[in-house]
Regions:
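RNA-interacting cores
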Residues: 1-176
Length: 176
C-alpha cells in the first residue's frame, strides 16, 4: 500500500472541486480499469492538497492540476505507540436507512469505528459541509492492535469512501 500527498494548483484543477469528478480522476490515476477492485481511498485535505492511499503508486500526473507529489509506502504503527490521527467522514448510522448522526454522538461513533485498533485519547471536529455533512476529525490515540489499525487504514471508515471520505491518516506523536 502507498500513501501519496499530491500538491494541486487550484487554478488548474477546474472541476475537481466536485466529489464525483475527483473520485473518477483518482481512480484513473491509480488504476485505469473501471472494473478493477484495487483499494483506493482519498481525501482533499485542503484546496491545494490531495491525499491518496492505494494498492499501487498513483500516476499523479494524471490528476488534473497536480504539480508535484510525495509517494511513500504506508507506515505500520506498533502497539503502544502514541499517534495523531486525521479523518474526513460523514458520520451516519443505519436506522432503517442511513441517517446523519448528531454531533453529540460523534465520540461514541469514533470509539466504535476505532474499537480494537486505537484507544482514543482526544478528538475534535470541524464541519466541512455537504450532504450528508462531512466533518474533518483530528485527535490523538494509542495503538492497541497494529494489524487492526492497518486494516482501518486500508479499507477506510464509514460511508462515502468513493467520494473522498473515510481515509484514516495516522502519524507518530512527537515525544514531549
Amino acid at each position: 500500500m502507498y500513501l501519496a500527498r499530491i500538491n494541486l494548483d487550484p487554478a488548474r484543477s477546474s472541476g475537481m472541486d466536485q466529489w464525483a469528478a475527483m473520485g473518477q480522476a483518482v481512480r484513473r490515476a491509480v488504476d485505469p480499469d473501471p472494473a478493477s477492485e484495487a483499494r483506493v481511498l482519498w481525501a482533499r485535505t485542503s484546496p491545494g492538497t490531495l491525499v491518496i492511499s492505494s494498492d499501487t503508486a498513483p500516476a499523479w500526473g494524471k490528476v488534473p492540476g497536480a504539480t508535484s507529489a510525495a509517494i511513500h509506502p504506508l507506515s505500520r504503527h506498533p502497539e503502544g505507540e502514541s499517534v495523531r490521527w486525521e479523518l474526513i467522514s460523514a458520520p451516519t448510522a443505519r436506522r432503517g436507512k442511513r441517517v446523519p448522526l448528531a454531533e453529540d454522538e460523534f465520540e461514541d461513533w469514533l470509539s466504535g469505528k476505532f474499537a480494537g485498533a486505537l484507544d482514543l485519547t482526544s478528538a475534535k471536529w470541524k464541519r466541512l459541509g455537504g450532504r450528508p455533512a462531512r466533518y474533518h476529525f483530528t485527535g490523538e490515540a494509542v495503538v492497541r492492535d497494529s494489524d487492526a489499525l492497518q486494516e482501518l487504514c486500508l479499507n477506510g471508515i464509514g460511508a462515502g469512501t468513493a467520494t473522498g471520505a473515510g481515509l484514516l491518516l495516522v502519524s507518530p506523536l512527537a515525544p514531549q
